[in-house]
């Protein structure tokens, strides 16, 4: 009897928990950059990837800015090195920054921007 009660309880609770988790909406972000002018823009917590890209370009402010990185439900960072710019995503700001500096792989790399969704 007790096993049947626990089983019924589990069958009732687990789907409710799964529904709660799937009800959390995705949040999107983007980083735009124009290397020559060092202009950048970030967007985060947008309901759609396109919204994030449009906002990042708007924040960048230069006509020749480009979206260099898109991310979802996490963080992203942008670093500029002697020859190129790099971007990376991570679950946290620290993880994204660590990844991008490793990818840049130069002592002269500098962090330019970062952003995280909720």
Q: What are the language-model segments listed below?
A:
Residues 2, 17-118:
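Helix-coil modules at protein/domain termini and other flexible surface or pore-lining loops
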Residues 6-18:
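Hydrophobic h-region of N-terminal signal peptides that target proteins for export
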